[in-house]
Amino acid sequence: YLNGARNRLGSSAAVGGTGFLFSQRILDESHGWRFYLLTEDIEFSIHHILRGERIAICEDAVLYDEQPTDFRQSVRQRLRWAKGYIQVFRRYGADLLKGTARGSWSCFDMSMSILPAFILTALGLLANLTLTALSLMQGDGVWFALRSLLECMGSILATLLVLGGITVASEWRRIHAPAWKKIAFTLTFPLFMLTYLPISMAALFMKVEWKPIHHSVNLTSLPSPAVKN
């Protein structure tokens, strides 16, 4: 969805670690592979966007991504991603902002992608919590503060639910799972995404190192000709 929209707007896409292709020229001009932050795919993308390269997508490409086996592994993976975004922004943030000031939409887009969105969300929640605490101490405006906090949380959850619903609806036939699971997972998707908040906050202070993520896939659950052959 993100890269498709970027491609249609003439902006640069971003590569994903699941799979991407680049020419020997790109590797030669970079003097070999020199991207070793925790999210090296995003680092690779931003490095070349800053050099004026445009990353495109192949609409017909099909990539199979193995997911973490359990919630604990998912937390470990997302903690690495969150820390990686911080690392990338620390290294390339100033150049991205300069590119944005020069009118580069791709630089602006990448800035908004790696600037931890949780910071804005956390600031909004923190402001509402602070207002609630002050109201409780002063004894006035408590319900106003609580309503503001609930509205903030409600808008976040509603937005995530809509995004998840659109994705599942448009990819319904490609998601090989019972209908009830698709619906249940769509409804619980906002709650899953909220777990990014503590994960991302932890990434600000924790020392995060790369650790293997356990993946597994049951081929019999993927009824496709490619698997059968």
Give the positions of each predicted feature.
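Short, hydrophobic alpha-helical packing/hinge segments within bilobed ligand-binding/sensory domains
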Residues: 44-45, 74
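Active-site-adjacent helix/loop segment of glycosyltransferases
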Residues: 69, 75-113
